[in-house]
């Protein structure tokens, strides 16, 4: 099992609408794709003063291949949607985490 982690840097001016979109649209789409089984949505705690907030979305998948298939099928649509909704107010990067225990 792996965790597909995406960390978002979210501007204060779109924070509320971003969380609403993630909870009501993005997470349900990810789970209903069949490639992910569980999720955790968290705020990243930092000591620094920064503009905006960092949000982590962790989705559990069977393996890296499942995430690759999701990216092939839905990755472009996700990128277009997040860009059209939030423009430069939301930036993100993704990483893979292997579940050890």
Tell me the role of every PLM-derived stretch.
Residues 40-53, 80-101:
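Glycine-rich beta-strand-turn "strand-cap" elements at beta-sheet edges
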């Amino acid at each position: 099992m792996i965790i597909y982690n995406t960390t978002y840097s979210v501007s204060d001016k779109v924070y509320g609408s971003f969380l609403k979109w993630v909870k009501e649209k993005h997470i349900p789409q990810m789970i209903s794709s069949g490639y992910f089984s569980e999720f955790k949505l968290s705020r990243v705690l930092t000591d620094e003063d920064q503009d905006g907030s960092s949000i982590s979305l962790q989705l559990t998948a069977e393996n890296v291949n499942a995430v690759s298939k999701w990216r092939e099928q839905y990755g472009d649509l996700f990128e277009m949607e997040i860009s059209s909704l939030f423009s430069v107010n939301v930036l993100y990067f993704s990483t893979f985490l292997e579940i050890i225990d």
